[in-house]
């Protein structure tokens, strides 16, 4: 008797476009490559304590409309230029959404938002948007969720995040060890920082793991380790952005032999998932920075053209410039928040 034991739960397998096809169709322009190189260098200097500016990763929770994303980028670029002496502003350009259960997984996975899962289209749209943003002079940041998409997009990312659900994952630590950009690891969803500290140490070491080449072939990858990794405080069972929390994290980092540097996420559990509270978190963190706290090297903010969020499932037409995932602050608050951060950096300098 013949037993069929393989692919029992697989409905269909489609070929994925090889990375090289996308890299040739949308090659990095000299301007885009220059934007990435300079931003990575600036972030490296901030992490090494050679630049006292604040890294600000700010933008929509997720990208679903490239047109609105480009308008946001144009507005943000003007503020980046204006506040460049105090802030290193990088746009949050998230294409992939880790879900606690199920839901829309982002522009790459389902670009047409209709459960058609045209991933090849998603990769094309994502790379073209990243290219346009970088070409304008605005650097981009993203979250890395798998081992394959970085081959399509990572050359256009100036900073990367590993999320709270994946910080403990071995494959994500291995991936971070080979990424060309600085990487932030979020504390665990329960608020523990040990997983992020372990992740920073792991990603700083060389690794050998499986991935794909630019030609789309399965490959064995050897990395040299990433020395530009840091922790992101995003809250847990309670917020963890206060001066008391920062002091505890600094102590934990020192004990682990790591530099006392933290980035604070104003959203997620730190805002108790209430988007307007990001402004309260900002006020508290600005007070710490203005008071001379040098350990706070960066912040993360969820912001869009229009405040709040909307449901993709409602069947209603989508409002322009409004998030379809986590709720974000609107543009007016964004402008005020960035100026507040810049003033705090000025005060820290005395």
From Swiss-Prot:
Coiled coil: none annotated. SUPFAM superfamilies: Aldolase (SSF51569). Pathway: Metabolic intermediate biosynthesis; chorismate biosynthesis; chorismate from D-erythrose 4-phosphate and phosphoenolpyruvate: step 1/7. It is an enzyme of class 2 (transferase). It catalyses: D-erythrose 4-phosphate + phosphoenolpyruvate + H2O = 7-phospho-2-dehydro-3-deoxy-D-arabino-heptonate + phosphate. GO terms for molecular function: 3-deoxy-7-phosphoheptulonate synthase activity; identical protein binding. It holds the Pfam family DAHP_synth_1. Homotetramer. Stereospecific condensation of phosphoenolpyruvate (PEP) and D-erythrose-4-phosphate (E4P) giving rise to 3-deoxy-D-arabino-heptulosonate-7-phosphate (DAHP). Belongs to the class-I DAHP synthase family. This is Phospho-2-dehydro-3-deoxyheptonate aldolase, Phe-sensitive. It comes from Escherichia coli (strain K12).
């Amino acid at each position: 008797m013949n037993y069929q034991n393989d692919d029992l739960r697989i409905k269909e397998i489609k070929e994925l476009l090889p990375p090289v096809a996308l890299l040739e169709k949308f090659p990095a322009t000299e301007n885009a490559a220059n934007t990435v190189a300079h931003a990575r260098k600036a972030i490296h200097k901030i992490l090494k304590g050679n630049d006292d500016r604040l890294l600000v990763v700010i933008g929509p929770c997720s990208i679903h409309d490239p047109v609105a994303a480009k308008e946001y980028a144009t507005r943000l670029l003007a503020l980046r230029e204006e506040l460049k002496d105090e802030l290193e502003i990088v746009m949050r350009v998230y294409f992939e959404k880790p879900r606690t259960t199920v839901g829309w997984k982002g522009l790459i996975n389902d670009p047409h938002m209709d459960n058609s899962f045209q991933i090849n289209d998603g990769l094309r749209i994502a790379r073209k948007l990243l290219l346009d943003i970088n070409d304008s002079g605005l650097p981009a940041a993203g979250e890395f969720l798998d081992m394959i998409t970085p081959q399509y997009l990572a050359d256009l990312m100036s900073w990367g995040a590993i999320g709270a659900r994946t910080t403990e994952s071995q494959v994500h630590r291995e991936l971070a060890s080979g990424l060309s950009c600085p990487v932030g690891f979020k504390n665990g969803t329960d608020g523990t920082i040990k997983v992020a500290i372990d992740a920073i140490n792991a990603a700083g070491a060389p690794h050998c793991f499986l991935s794909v080449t630019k030609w789309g072939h399965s490959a064995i990858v050897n990395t040299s380790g990433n020395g530009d990794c840091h922790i992101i405080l995003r809250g847990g069972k309670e917020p963890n952005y206060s001066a008391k929390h920062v002091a505890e994290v600094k102590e934990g980092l020192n004990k682990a032999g790591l530099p006392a540097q933290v980035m604070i996420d104003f959203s997620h559990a730190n805002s108790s998932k209430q988007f307007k509270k990001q402004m309260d978190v900002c006020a508290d963190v600005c007070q710490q920075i203005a008071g001379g706290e040098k350990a706070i090297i960066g912040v993360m903010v969820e912001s869009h053209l229009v405040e709040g969020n909307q449901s993709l499932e409602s069947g209603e037409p989508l409002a322009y410039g409004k998030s379809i995932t986590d709720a974000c602050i609107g543009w007016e608050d964004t402008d005020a928040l960035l100026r507040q951060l810049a003033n705090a950096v000025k005060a820290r300098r005395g």
